[in-house]
Design a protein with these regions (language model features):
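C-terminal catalytic domain of photolyase/cryptochrome flavoproteins
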Residues: 1-129
């Protein structure tokens, strides 16, 4: 996984206008959800569909934003669903993300396992992305 404190230190080191009292809660609490929901009401995770809607992040990308488990599937898709599955106990009661859990429940077991296997493979090979 990621080390939220290392990311926090990185932000402080590269941005001349980064003030710890602002940057620490934003990095650890909001963007990393590393405080378990003390500051943010939901984790900031997204699939390719959301990233594509919010900007031109997918334009020119070698990954297919509509695919989930193929070799050219956008990594964000499998990682998104696997994140929610991995954190079901912590997050499933949160009304702000209930729709994600309802969608996850409707998926066929084989489709879910393919997503989770893809996510495990992605995390094991991050340097190859």
């Amino acid at each position: 996984g990621l080390n939220p404190n290392a990311l926090h230190q990185w932000y402080l080191g590269i941005y001349i206008d980064a003030f710890e009292w602002v940057e620490l809660p934003n990095t650890v609490g909001m963007s990393q959800f590393a405080d378990g929901g003390g500051l943010a009401t939901k984790p900031y995770v997204s699939s390719a569909a959301y990233l594509d809607r919010m900007g031109d992040h997918c334009a020119g990308c070698r990954y297919d934003k509509k695919q989930k488990t193929t070799a050219d599937a956008c990594p964000f898709n499998a990682l998104y669903w696997e994140f929610y599955d991995r954190h079901t106990r912590l997050l499933s009661h949160n009304p702000r993300i209930g729709m994600a859990y309802r969608q996850l429940e409707k998926m066929q077991p084989e489709a879910k396992e393919a997503l989770f296997e893809k996510a495990r493979s992605l995390r094991a090979n991050l340097n190859a992305l």
